[in-house]
Design a protein with these regions (language model features):
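Outer-membrane beta-barrel translocator domains and adjoining extracellular loop/strand segments
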Residues: 12-14, 43-48, 88-97, 143-150, ...
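Outer-membrane beta-barrel transmembrane strands
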Residues: 10-15, 69, 111, 124, ...
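Residues that define the transmembrane beta-barrel architecture of outer-membrane proteins
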Residues: 13-17, 54-60, 74, 109-115, ...
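Predominantly the C-terminal beta-signal and adjacent terminal strand-loop region
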Residues: 122-179
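Gram-negative (and chloroplast) outer-membrane scaffold detector with strong preference
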Residues: 28-101, 113, 125, 164-166
């Protein structure tokens, strides 16, 4: 699946995109791997570099999602992502200058652990296509990056996504019709 979302970190807009690969067990529980990319227009001034910076984060990990009402066209699910990643700042000049290239080092990033529970409505469009819409809350470990007023990337994200796969929608592919 692929998803995108809009949220907020420290009062500023945050944009998120994600990918996930999962196995759906008995149409009731999804288990797999998910990864997310987050960008937030923070415009934090860095005195040592004399520039304004924005926040970026990349994290991924174990994806668990119990699914209720799995035999219906509309399902309710409770996704949970448990994982780790990196958070850092980048010069916001790249938004305005196509020729700008920034050299990033390991000092520009800090490790972060993330737990991201949520609630989704899943819409079965066809046997191979599902659309999801929902809300998640991101809990993170503390980060320590200069120049920061942000110590965590906690926050709500509302998003939509699309899942492609084989969704049986209540059909048993192994059951034979006997006449």
């Amino acid at each position: 699946g692929i998803n995108m979302g809009l949220g907020e970190i420290d009062g500023e807009n945050a944009y998120m995109g994600g990918l996930k690969i999962a196995y759906v067990a008995n149409q009731q529980f999804e288990v797999g791997f998910a990864s997310n990319f987050l960008y937030s227009e923070q415009d934090i001034y860095n005195n040592s570099l004399s520039r304004y910076e924005d926040l970026i984060a990349v994290y991924g990990g174990l994806h668990l999602e119990p699914i209720l009402f799995s035999k219906n066209r509309v399902n309710l699910s409770f996704p949970l992502l448990l994982g780790a990643g990196a958070v850092g700042y980048v010069d916001n000049k790249f938004r305005h200058d196509d020729d700008f290239e920034e050299e990033l080092t390991e000092d520009d990033f800090d490790a972060v652990f993330v737990a991201e529970p949520g609630v989704n409505a899943l819409f079965n469009i066809s046997r191979y296509l599902q659309i999801e819409a929902g809300v998640k809350y991101r809990f993170s470990s503390k980060i320590d990056l200069p120049p920061t007023r942000i110590t965590r990337i906690n926050g709500f994200t509302a998003g939509i996504g699309i899942k492609v796969g084989i969704f049986n929608m209540g059909r048993n592919r192994y059951k034979k019709n006997v006449q």
